[in-house]
């Protein structure tokens, strides 16, 4: 488009947009590097080792054993310990209740707490055996326990009888001594002959008993424990036990 000079416009200052070429488009160059993932070599992973047939059988047997040991046996044992014979077994209905069978066979055992350690361990071992080898235990609990409980029960009762027979009650106390007292009884220390437990001193008001069955105040007990052997004998007549050994005296708390 042309302009005449009468318009007062300088022709050299007019831009002809129809004939000028388009300005070049500036492309923005990213500052980040472009990574070609196809050019990166793949990591090499070692192949799994080939197990021998024996190792495969061992692994398969171990997996089967872990599957055959369900958690309900452990939870059943825990419930049995806390709840006693009221808990019913979680196995199939054809299996008899374990604690119920024990209670019927031995009425003395009303709960697990009354079982001896050997009988309790027998129950735990049986439950562990059933979990590991379920195919070997087809309702044979009665036969198993009937063969094992009688011997264990006899051992348990015989040990109680031996304890009862070997126990010898102590003889009557000597004159001036007692084994039962009340608030009105005045007890004195065999060494200082002062009342026990009435002193305002914290050390002297403490009570110390001896293996020979006598009670000293805290001050006299400290002297006897730290004295030489010849001077550490119990001062009760016809006693003479040495009281300076490690476990000859212990403090009583009241």
Curated annotation (Swiss-Prot):
Broadest EC class assigned to this enzyme? transferase
In UniProt terms, what function does this protein have?
Mediates ubiquitination and subsequent desumoylation/degradation of sumoylated proteins and proteins containing SUMO-like domains. Involved in maintaining genome stability where it acts in the cellular response to DNA damage. Has a role in meiosis.
What organism does the record attribute this protein to? Schizosaccharomyces pombe (strain 972 / ATCC 24843)
GO CC aspect terms? chromatin; nucleus; site of double-strand break; SUMO-targeted ubiquitin ligase complex
Composition-biased stretches, type Polar residues, lie in: 1-10
**Keywords in alphabetical order:** Meiosis, Metal-binding, Nucleus, Transferase, Ubl conjugation pathway, Zinc, Zinc-finger
The identity of this protein, by name, is E3 ubiquitin-protein ligase complex slx8-rfp subunit rfp1
Return the EC number: 2.3.2.27
